[in-house]
UniProtKB/Swiss-Prot annotation:
UniProt binding sites for Zn(2+) 1: H98, H100, H161
Stated name of the protein: Metallo-beta-lactamase type 2
Keyword line: Antibiotic resistance, Hydrolase, Metal-binding, Periplasm, Signal, Zinc
NCBIfam families xref list: bla_class_B_core, bla_subclass_B1, blaB, blaB-IND-MUS
PROSITE patterns in the record: BETA_LACTAMASE_B_1, BETA_LACTAMASE_B_2
One Gene Ontology MF term: zinc ion binding
Entry's transmembrane regions: none
Binding, substrate: K183
Cofactor: Zn(2+)
Chain's gene name: blaB4
Amino acid sequence: MMKKMKWALVLALGLTGLNAFGQETPEVKIEKLKDNLYVYTTYNTFNGTKYAANAVYLVTSKGVVVIDSPWGEEKFKNFTDEIYKRHGKKVIMNIATHSHDDRAGGLEYFKSLGAKTYSTKMTDSILAKDNKPRAQYTFDNNKSFKVGKDEFQVYYPGKGHTADHVVVWFPKDKVLVGGCIIKSGDSKDLGFLGEAYVNDWTQSVHNIQKKFPNVQYVVAGHDDWKDQTAIQHTLDLISEYQQKQKASN
C-alpha cells in the first residue's frame, strides 16, 4: 500500500527537482493574478518534504470556473469555502488538464457541488482505465468556452509530460495556464518521465509558442509560477536531457 501511495504521489508531482516549502505554508494559498483570475497553490508531502502544485480559477458573473483541483481531497472543502468567502460565488465549472491526481482529483467533488465537470476524451479514457472518477462532459483536444462575458480556450499542444495534457489560454488577460507540460523557471530537471514523451515535448512547447505568441503570464504546474522564464527553461531542460541521453548511448 505504501509503495502505491508513493508512486501516485510521484505521478502527481511531475518532477523531482521541486524546491521544498517550509511548514508554515498554508493548506491553500490564493493570489490574485489579474482582475478576475486567481492562482491557487496547494501542497502535498512526499518523503517528509512539502511540494507545491499551481492552478487557477476564474470569477465570472455566473460563478467560479476552477481549472484543475487542489492537491489532496482533504483540501477540497476548505478551498471552495474560501472561494465563497472571498467572492460570494459558487463553483459552477471544473476542467481537468490531465489525468493525474493534482489535476483530475477533484472531479467527483466538484460534481457533488453541482458544478459541470470537463476533460478531454483522451484524459477520460485514462481515468476510465484507471477506474478513477471521470468528468461529466468530454471534448476533443481543443475547445473554446464562454461563461458570462468571459472567454477562455483549452488547447492540446501534443505529447510531453504525459500524452493527454492540455493548456488553458485566457485571451483577455494574456494568461497561459501551462500545467505540467511547462516546468517552473527553477526546476532542476524534467522530473517524472514514466508517462512522458520526451522526443515530442519540444515540438509541443513550440506549438504552444506558435499558438499563443503574446503570453504575458505563464502559470507552471509546480513550484515558482511567478518566474516567467518557464517556457524557455522547459525547452532548455528538454535539450539537456536529450544531450545526456545521447552521450550515454
